From Swiss-Prot:
Keywords: Acetylation, Isopeptide bond, Phosphoprotein, Ubl conjugation. It comes from the Eukaryota. Residues 1-12, 768-777 have a biased composition (Acidic residues). This is G patch domain-containing protein 1. Residues 465-478, 894-903 have a biased composition (Low complexity).
Length: 930
């Protein structure tokens, strides 16, 4: 048993790497998931997938590039003594271990070579080697190499030899009879299909009789069949020129086109030197060639492709006149007269036909019958019911064709019970098939009454809608069901007159329309010969039948368009929850003004739309323009939501702003004018008069109605308006006041310049200061003259306004003047909304009487500035001290001016307004639309 165990152990072969045995009580480790596995080399280091030849940049010896060890070697070993041992390095010496591994660029793996080939070398290759040896400078030099090199046999060759196979024998089971050799007898000639005599075979058979029975022979060796596919268009066994040798060979090389293929094969098969008796030595021409003579071309034995055309060219004239390939136009020139008679152009390479073409036989068209209709009209399909049975009968009889029996039904209109009744079957007594069968008789009668009432209401509603929809003159064809219902209503509802009056399918032919209306009247009466009575007897039978069909189809299918549309539309199933709709913000209230301006033919700015449009950021980038709204997230027109169904959407009321020439109360006017003058608005600020003129809707309402402005009554000013007299204000005084306000508003006050440019004006050079002093001297005289004029105008203005009471008057300024004013105001862009600053209340309360005091204070401050500048010229060395003094004096002057203005307002100003009154006035101010 022990011996058997040892033998069995020796016979076992282990494959792969065995697992490490587990200790007792130790659990097997869990497999590591794929994402946690790492690739390591044989030394346990992380493998990096890059090397000198495997892609990526080498990071040095163990990735030490950039470190101290990577730049300087740790130990220096001289290689001077090992110079003799150096050998030629190959690519493998520069490769890493990864490159020589299984997945590298030069894996060291077992590769199949010639030793493991399935067959020996080809005989043709061996013969080629023999030829190379014969043509070598030293004949037979390659034979020595063949003697030295060992014979290489494949593994299959060795296996076959061990199995008893020998060269020249076939592979397979051995046979008993000997392979016979068939040698043809040269003296025997064979004629026809006769077989040769079998004398030689009989002699061989006699020889086979002497062989013992237990002798077997190897099978005959079979030559392998060449299964190379034919992938060209040449003939079988054709071998043309080698294009590589012919086109890319040396210019001195020639192709031997006349050397036979047998000679080439004989070279490959051997016996070259022996059969032809080739002598080795110098071969050349028989006669010598002089230095100045050229060698004759061997035109019979050599040929080059340079003598042939390699590019397709146009045929030279006259080349096609000769040879059997010439076209027929050169050969057949016997009938030139026929070609000359031909008018058209004969194409090159073609000639006129000698025989004419056979003409096609054309048959006449068939004759149409007299009652033929080129268009097929489909008859209206009317369901055969008890209600419209007489309609079907009238239609069938009037058209001259016998209609089908009303009682007969098609198979598609019958159910199982009706088919059973026709066949005479007894109905099956079983459970009730309908819920109505379980109801009592009273319930059934009540349901029937309700159904009749609903049917009656539906019929009345349809008749009413048909009568209402008779307003449209165009008729539309409907479905057969709709046509049937309208037909029934037209016959039974008494609406024939409305149909005849409104639906006129034959309006172009009044006589035909009249006959059609008569046909409808007779149809309503139920007369069977309605069509025959209406038709014209002078017409032919074909026309009468055609008109009969048209009348029947028109009476059936023509329904009013309103009833057709009402049957196609239903009420909405779901209502929208939102009661608001989005509209463009700038188009919300301008519709009525623009429409009225268009009616008055006042085109231009009144009908022009200005939208606030937010472009996309990409659009600004494409056109290289700055984004006008950089912080906006909107794209397009900003929209606001308003109520869908609101009464105010359809109202176009003018704004409650007063007219441009509307007067103000006597006490309110000086306060507002004084406040405007004291505030010194810039060119961007607009007065109330300009705001009133800017309202387009009010201007249009004035031009339309020529009425006064809406009166604004206030509780605080009502008593003062009643007490004031009513003389008409002088227009010349108002014009002077307007001119004065415009002149003063054109240039802002000096206080504004002081507040902005105070620090920068002190640091200017002395030369600029001298020029400013000269200019200020000239300005003083003009300002003093203007002050006197302004004081006088203000005094006259106050007296006139106090004595006068406002009276509504018509606008006197025409539209062109107003348009010019709007253009001047919008010269620097659109107007800005009015600014309400916290100090506006104090400025509004300053009366107009304090204006002269302010102008005097300004002159005083200017004189002080002038004196200080003169001091600066004298004391240029002490600039810092003078700057401090100037700042102190400026502060004192500004404080004095503010104190004086406050004291003036306290002394001469009216009582302060309450916050409620000020808020009410601010709400009454008209808003400007931009």
């Amino acid at each position: 048993m022990a011996a058997l165990d040892s033998d069995s152990d020796e016979d076992l072969i282990s494959y792969g790497t065995g697992l490490e045995p587990l200790d007792e009580g130790e659990r097997p480790k869990k497999p590591i998931p794929l994402q946690d596995q790492t690739v390591r080399d044989e030394k346990g280091r992380y493998k990096r997938f890059h090397g000198a030849f495997s892609g990526g940049f080498s990071a040095g010896y163990f990735n030490t590039v950039g470190s101290k060890e990577g730049w300087t070697p740790s130990t220096f070993v001289s290689s001077r003594q090992n110079r003799a041992d150096k050998s030629a390095l190959g690519p493998e010496d520069f490769m890493d271990e990864e490159d020589l591994s299984e997945f590298g660029i030069a894996p060291k793996a077992i590769v199949t070579t010639d030793d493991f080939a399935s067959k020996t070398k080809d005989r043709i290759r061996e013969k080629a080697r023999q030829l190379a040896a014969a043509a070598a400078p030293i004949p037979g030099a390659t034979l020595l190499d063949d003697l030295i090199t060992p014979a290489k046999l494949s593994v299959g060759f060795e296996l076959l030899r061990k199995m008893g196979w020998k060269e020249g024998q076939g592979v397979g089971p051995r046979v008993k009879r000997k392979a016979r050799r068939q040698k043809p007898d040269p003296g025997v000639k064979i004629y026809g299909c006769a077989l040769p005599p079998g004398g030689s075979e009989e002699s061989e058979d006699e020889d086979d009789d002497y062989l013992p029975d237990n002798v077997t022979f190897a099978p005959k060796d079979v030559m392998p069949v060449d299964f190379t596919p034919k992938d060209n268009v040449h003939g079988l066994a054709y071998k043309g020129l080698d294009p590589h040798q012919a086109l890319f060979g040396m210019p001195g090389e020639h192709l031997n086109l006349f050397g036979g293929a047998s000679e080439g094969t004989s070279h490959l098969l051997g016996d070259v030197g022996l059969s032809k008796g080739r002598k080795l030595g110098i071969s050349g021409q028989a006669f010598g060639v002089g230095a100045l003579e050229e060698e004759d071309d061997d035109i019979y034995a050599t040929e080059t492709l340079s003598k042939y055309d390699t590019v397709l060219k146009d045929e030279e004239p006259g080349d096609g006149l000769y040879g059997w390939t010439a076209p027929k136009q050169y050969k057949n020139q016997k009938e030139p007269e026929r070609d000359l008679r031909y008018v058209g152009k004969i194409l090159e390479g073609f000639s006129l036909a000698s025989k004419p073409l056979s003409s096609k036989k054309i048959y006449p068209p068939p004759q149409l019958p007299r009652d033929y209709r080129p268009v097929h009209y489909f008859r209206p399909v009317v369901a055969a019911t008890a209600e419209n049975a007489h309609v079907l009968q009238v239609l069938s009889e009037s058209s001259g064709k016998a209609g089908q029996d009303v009682g007969t039904h098609s198979r598609h209109q019958l159910n199982a019970s009706k088919r059973g009744e026709l066949l005479g079957e007894m109905p099956i007594q079983g459970s009730a098939t309908s819920v109505l069968e379980f109801l009592s008789q009273k319930d059934k009668e009540r349901i029937k009454e309700v159904k009749q009432a609903t049917d009656l209401k539906a019929a009345q509603a349809k008749a009413r809608s048909l009568a209402q929809s008779a307003s449209s003159s165009r008729a539309q064809a409907s479905t057969p069901d709709l046509g049937h219902s309208s037909w029934h209503l037209a016959l039974g509802g008494g609406t024939v007159t409305t149909r005849a009056n409104n639906f006129k399918p034959f309006a172009k032919d009044p006589e035909k329309q009249r006959r059609y209306e008569e046909f409808l009247v007779h149809m309503k009466k139920g007369q069977k010969d309605a069509l025959e009575r209406c038709l014209d007897p002078s017409m032919t039978e074909w026309e009468r039948s055609r008109e009969r069909e048209e009348f029947a189809r028109a009476a059936q299918l023509y329904v009013s368009s309103n009833s057709t549309l009402s049957s196609r539309f239903t009420h909405a199933k779901e209502e929208e929850d939102s009661d608001q709709v989005e509209v463009p913000r700038d188009q919300e209230n301008d519709v009525s003004d623009k429409q009225s301006a268009v009616k008055m033919k006042m085109f231009g700015k009144l009908t022009r739309d200005t939208f606030e449009w937010h472009p996309d950021k990409l659009l600004c980038k494409r056109f290289n323009v700055p984004d006008p709204y950089p912080g906006s997230t909107l794209v397009g027109l900003p929209r606001v939501k308003r109520d869908k169904y609101s009464v105010f959407n359809f109202l176009t009321l003018p704004e409650p702003a007063p007219l441009p020439t509307a007067p103000v109360p006597s006490e309110k006017a000086p306060q507002q004018r004084g406040s405007d003058k004291s505030r010194k608005p810039s060119r961007w600020d607009t007065s109330k008069q300009e705001k009133k003129e800017d309202s387009i809707s009010e201007f249009l309402s004035q031009a339309r109605s020529k009425v006064g402005p809406p009166k604004q009554e206030s509780s605080a000013l009502g008593s003062k308006e009643e007490q004031a007299p009513e003389p008409r204000p002088d227009t010349t005084v108002d014009k002077a006041v307007d001119a004065q306000t415009d002149g003063e508003g054109s240039r802002p006050s000096m206080d504004l310049f002081k507040a902005i440019f105070a620090s920068s004006s002190d640091e200017k050079s002395s030369s600029s200061e001298e020029e400013q002093d000269d200019s200020e001297d000239s300005q003083e005289h003009t300002e003093e003259a203007s002050l006197k004029g302004s004081q006088e105008a203000a005094a006259g203005e106050t007296s006139v306004v106090l004595a006068a009471e406002p009276e509504p008057c018509e606008p006197a300024t025409p539209f062109p003047i107003q348009k010019a004013q709007i253009d001047e105001r919008e010269e620097f862009g659109p107007r800005l909304p009015p600014v309400f600053c916290p100090n506006s209340r104090q400025k509004l309360e300053i009366p107009q009487k304090e204006k002269p005091k302010k102008s005097k204070e300004r002159h005083k401050s200017k004189k002080e500035h002038r004196r200080k500048r003169e001091k600066k010229k004298k004391h240029k060395k002490h600039k810092h001290k003078s700057k401090q003094k100037n700042k102190k004096s400026e502060k004192n002057s500004s404080s004095e001016s503010t104190d004086s203005s406050d004291s003036g307002s306290d002394d001469g100003g009216p009582a302060e307004l309450s916050p409620q009154e000020l808020l009410r006035r601010l709400k009454c101010l008209p808003l400007r639309r931009q």
